[in-house]
Amino acid sequence: MIAEEALNKTWFIDIDGTIVKQLYNQDIDKAIDSLGENSYTIETPIEKSVTFLNRIPKEDTVVLTTARDGKHKDHTERMLSHFGVRYDRIMFDLRAGPRYLINDIKPAGTAGNTDPINTAFSLNVERDEGIDLKV
């Protein structure tokens, strides 16, 4: 096993268009106004993404990211629970533009590795198509 595989990972994964079909804040507002606590029923899961998330090892950390307003926290958490989505944290109120992940390269010998380890990766997926990746 290479050193990178032995390290616990942190996954930053967007919600809308990646885990569930794309919705906008105004759509969620309307659902909350008309359906109250059942507003999450307007959401459509992308099954292969839910499956992917639930295959991530429990030792890894899953941070969901979203441009959803923080006022939609309860709605979003109910929806994720209803669909059985595994996560550790959610970051709300992010900008809808590009997201950058910047991290250092672990030098040889710092994690039992003989070579440097890259510690930042990114993957773009087609909107509403889900995550097609093996864990």
PLM regions and their residue ranges:
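HAD-like aspartate-dependent phosphatase fold
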Residues: 1-135
